[in-house]
Amino acid sequence: MEHIQKGIAGEQKACAFLEQQGYKIIEKNLRIGKGEIDLIAVHNNCMCFIEVKYRKHNRYGFPEEFVTQKKLLKIQETAEAYIYTVNWQGRIRFDVVAITGEELPVHLMDVTL
């Protein structure tokens, strides 16, 4: 499977997982300027900006270990632009959904810099 196809498959798996948990996905692969956010969802009146990381196996590390501080900062900047655009007044949160092969996704909530 090609790199991009793996990413798409990982995001689809993350969406299904989050929807089962009661999240409403409102955006996928949102691009603003040079920034991109994999998923934006609303859960319990909180807007969640979600980075999805997929790895076929953990041989070189867990997927969540590949979310860098630089990446989180770029997501935060992009989220600020989105929040302004949609005039969101509620709570926000930054999450990571890590997927390894066929295992259940790992959902890390409220990830900080």
Curated annotation (Swiss-Prot):
InterPro entries: Restrct_endonuc-II-like, tRNA_endonuc-like_dom_sf, UPF0102_YraN-like. Coiled coil: none annotated. GO terms for molecular function: nucleic acid binding. Belongs to the UPF0102 family. HAMAP family: UPF0102. This is UPF0102 protein CHU_0465. The lineage of its organism: Bacteria, Pseudomonadati, Bacteroidota, Cytophagia, Cytophagales.
